[in-house]
């Protein structure tokens, strides 16, 4: 890795540690009777210049979020009923930016998941926190209180000029603080 990718010893050690952790998690998956659940939240603080995902700026769609969650809850009930006999291995709430939801909405969604599915075989429950400008202490507390095992923060870049150009309304410092 050092020669091919010009990676530092520190980054090489980090990559190896992550690979070992992931290998341990993957070895626990039940590939025959298990499944993973992806839940999409299509709202973001703003639309990034490069983004190809289906997402909507929250400012324009805020009054539709609860209706979206109502529909999502019905879909979760359907999926849970269809898969009751299978082992739920992992859950990923992605987007968009799920942490654009208000704390009570995020809590509502996670509680619905916890009530609808058997999580006894779930080895990882991830919420994409995507953008540091959407993370608050209250939202982090909701995630902790609901047993979320992993969050994903994706700044896209650590160069402020690039963040500004691509439409990310957060700073490099906010990413570090997150």
Predicted regions and their residues:
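Conserved non-cysteine loop/helix-boundary elements of the Radical SAM core domain that shape
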Residues: 55-178
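Hydrophobic secondary-structure block in the mid-to-C-terminal portion of proteins
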Residues: 34-38, 43, 60
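Local cysteine-cluster metal-coordination motifs and their immediate loop/turn environment
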Residues: 40-55
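Membrane-targeting and insertion segments and their boundary/processing signals
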Residues: 22, 42-46, 149
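Structural motif
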Residues: 34-36, 48, 124
